[in-house]
Structure formats: C-alpha cells, structure tokens
Curated annotation (Swiss-Prot):
Organism: Bunodosoma granuliferum (Red warty sea anemone)
Gene Ontology CC terms, in alphabetical order: extracellular region; nematocyst
Name of the protein described by the UniProt record: Delta-actitoxin-Bgr2b
Gene Ontology MF term list: sodium channel regulator activity; toxin activity
UniProt family annotation: Belongs to the sea anemone sodium channel inhibitory toxin family. Type I subfamily.
Keywords from the UniProt entry: Cardiotoxin, Disulfide bond, Ion channel impairing toxin, Nematocyst, Neurotoxin, Secreted, Toxin, Voltage-gated sodium channel impairing toxin
Cysteine pairs bridged by disulfides in the record: 4-45, 6-35, 28-46
GO biological process: one example: regulation of signal transduction
Secreted is among the record's keywords: yes
Its job: Binds voltage-dependently at site 3 of sodium channels (Nav) and inhibits the inactivation of the activated channels, thereby blocking neuronal transmission. Has effect on SCN4A/SCN1B, and SCN5A/SCN1B, has no effect on SCN2A/SCN1B, and SCN10A/SCN1B. Possesses the highest efficacy for the insect sodium channel para/tipE. Also interacts with sodium channels in cardiac cells. Shows lethality to crabs.
C-alpha cells in the first residue's frame, strides 16, 4: 500500500520519513495500530 506519515514521524517538511502504511478498507489489520491521531484523513495510517 501507499506510505503515510505517522504522528511519530514528526512535522511535515521536505525529507520526512513515512513509516506508516495507508489502509483504506476498514480498520488496521490484526497486530497493527493506527499511528495517526487526528486531522482530515482518508482511511487509517497503520503501523506494525
């Protein structure tokens, strides 16, 4: 899937590392967690 920015990745700027995986269907899979707290966002940003 596509990469997405977790809250722990820091503020948005050039050269950010995107450690999350965008999950569009339902919630994060078992063993993963949503790593993005808030904001206008489609789907979930999941991380193992």
């Amino acid at each position: 899937g596509a990469s997405c920015r977790c809250d722990s990745d820091g503020p948005t700027s050039r050269g950010d590392t995107l450690t999350g995986t965008l999950w569009l269907i339902g919630r994060c899979p078992s063993g993963w967690h949503n790593c993005r707290g808030s904001g206008p966002f489609i789907g979930y940003c999941c991380k193992q």
